[in-house]
Amino acid sequence: MLVVKKTPKIKGILSAPPSKSYTHRAVICASLANGISNLKNPLNGADCLSSAHACEMFGAEIELSNETWVVRGSELKTPDNIVDIGNSGTTLRILTGISSQISNGYTVLTGDDSIRKRPMQPLLDALNQLGLTCFSTKNNGTAPIVVKSGKISNNVVEIRGDVSSQFITSIMMTLPFSENDSEIVLTTPLKSEPYLNITIDVLDKFGVKIEKNEEKNKSGYKIKGNQKYLPCDYTIEGDYSSASYLVAAGVLLNSDIVIKNVFKDSKQGDREIIEIVKKMGANVEINEDHVKITGPYKLKGIEIDVTDIPDLVPTIAVLGCFADGKTVVYNGEHVRLKECDRLAACTTELSKMGAEIEEKKDGLIITGVHKLNGAKLKTYHDHRLVMAFTIAGMLADGETIIEGEDSVKISFPDFVDNMKSIGSNIEVI
C-alpha cells in the first residue's frame, strides 16, 4: 500500500519514463526484422517486458539492460508453450495478429485475470475477415486466444474506428506479411488516432510503410504487400501519459520542477496535457525537450474531448477537483475498456475523498471543491489510477491510503522514488 500525506512543496528535476507505447511497438518490430536492432532508452516496465519475453518465444534473441535492448530478429517460429503475456493488453492484441504468420501450427495467448476479461472479439472478427483462423477458447471474445498459422487471403478488412486502437495497430503490423496490397476500412469515426500515428511512425523506422486513405468518403489505411521489417537503431522518447501526473502535481502544488525527456514535437496524443493545463490557467513553459513548471496556479474548469487522449482521464479528474467551476470530460466511452472502467473508478474513489463527480455514459462532470480529504482508495490494479490518486492525496487533508501501488511498475517503475526525490510526502508500507 501507498501512504500519501499533504505535501507543502515540491522542487527538483525529473525525467519522464520512456514511452510504453513506443517501447512495445519497437521491440515487436525489431523482433520481426532479420538482423540486430539496438533499442535505446526502453521502458523496463512489466508490460514492455511481457512484449520482449513473448517475442523471444516467437524466435527473437533479446539482451535486456536498463539503457539498451539488443534485439536479434529472425523468422517467426511456433512457440514451444502457451504465450502468457501477464497484464499487457497491448502485447496480447498486437501478437494475436502477428502470431498468424508463424510457418505452421498454432499459438495460444493468454494472461492474468484482468487480461482474460479484456474484449478481443472485434480483432478476432477482423483477422477472420482476412482469411485467418483465430478464436476465443471460451467463445466469448476474451483470452485465452487460439491463432492458427495461415496466409492472408482477403485484402480488405473492415473494423470500427471507435474500438481499441490496439486492434487496428495489430492489423497494421500484420498486413505487411500479405502477398498483396491491403486496405483497412474504418466503418465508424476513428478514436485514439495518435496511437495509430505512433504505430505508423515506428513501422516507418523499421522499413514498413502505411498510407492513410485520403479518398473522399473513405476512412482507413493502405498497406503494400510483401514488405520486410528492417533492423535499425532506435531511441525511445519519454512518455507524456506518465509525465501528466508530474505536470498535474506541478500546477496544483507549490512547485518549482523541470520534467525532462518530453519533446515538443512528439506524436503522442497525451502531449495534450500541456495544452489542457494552459487552457485551465497554468503558465507552463514548454521547451524542445523539457517542461518547466512553477506552481501553484488558479485553475478554471473547461470542457475536454478525450476521443484521442483516454489515458489522461484520471489526471484530468484530479485537476478538475481543484478548478473553479465545472470540468466536463466527454467522448470517453472507450475509457471504460482500459485496465478497468476508469470513468466509474474515478467517480467512486475520488468521491470517497469528497470530490463532486457525476459519471456520464461517455465521460465525467467534475465540480471543483478545492479541498479533498484523505481516504482509503482502491485502484483496481490500474497503474494510472495509482499515480493520479497519489497527486490527489498530496493535496488532501489527512492521510490517503492507496491499494495496489505495485501496478505502477507497468509504466513508471520509479514513480514513488521520483516523487519522493522532489519532496512528495509518500511512503510504501
UniProtKB/Swiss-Prot annotation:
Catalyzes the transfer of the enolpyruvyl moiety of phosphoenolpyruvate (PEP) to the 5-hydroxyl of shikimate-3-phosphate (S3P) to produce enolpyruvyl shikimate-3-phosphate and inorganic phosphate. This is 3-phosphoshikimate 1-carboxyvinyltransferase. GO terms for molecular function: 3-phosphoshikimate 1-carboxyvinyltransferase activity. HAMAP family: EPSP_synth. 3-phosphoshikimate binds at K20, S21, R25, S164, S165, Q166, S192, D311, K338. Pathway: Metabolic intermediate biosynthesis; chorismate biosynthesis. Phosphoenolpyruvate binds at K20, G89, R118, Q166, R342, R384. Signal peptide: none annotated. The active site is at D311 (proton acceptor). It is found in: Cytoplasm. GO terms for cellular component: cytoplasm.
